[in-house]
Amino acid sequence: MAMILEHVNYSYGVGTGKEFHALKDINLQIGDHEFIGLVGHSGSGKSTLIQLMNGLLRATEGTIYWDGQDIYDKSFSMRSLRGQVGLVFQYPEYQLFAESVIADVEYGPRNLGWSNLDVEYRSYEALKQVGIGENLLDVSPLSLSGGQKRRVAIAGVLAMAPKLLILDEPMAGLDPSGREEMLTLLSKLYEERQISIVLVSHNMDDVAKYADRIL
């Protein structure tokens, strides 16, 4: 697995007369089993960059490669990319919507066209890995604590078996103990799943202890 960004630019409002250059000439390579910290102040373009990496935004200029393929090539499957490059947005608990925890986690892998057996197995395993017990599978995700909701949201992305997991400010709004628990969880996922992780934060202290390199 590798993601390569070559001379990537992104501008908002192109052609409106109010164009804003969010990213300029970004060159980046992410290899197998890397833990990368993406650190910067608010408005520095961190969220824009990770949406480009997941295919939610299209670069104004430049090229992005995933496993050697140009993601903007007509033959490339963006659906496949979004399964392999998992993106957990900031405050992901606000995006929970299903009637039960297990149904919420199963939603993503079902949309990838997997068999019911695969969907159920991967969803149960993902929930187990983030510390959500079987006693919570059938309850409404809205009845969970804030920390549990966030874990369920992360499980929903993990259930799609991503090779690259990107998290946008996953410690936002958590108290010190919650922040440490989240970082410990991410470190565990990194080792057990042998995936690459991009951890977005404005706080250097959050990432310095765990990241292999910081951007």
Residue ranges and their predicted role:
Residues A161:
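Conserved catalytic motifs of ABC-family nucleotide-binding domains
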Residues G62-D73, L81:
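Conserved ABC transporter NBD signature motif
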Residues S140-L144, Q148:
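Conserved ABC ATPase signature
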Residues L117-N135:
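Conserved ABC ATPase "signature" region
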Residues N54:
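Helix-to-loop junction immediately C-terminal to a conserved catalytic motif
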Residues V39-H41:
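The feature captures the beta-strand-to-loop junction immediately N-terminal to the Walker
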Residues L165-D168:
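Catalytic Walker B motif of ABC-type/P-loop ATPase nucleotide-binding domains
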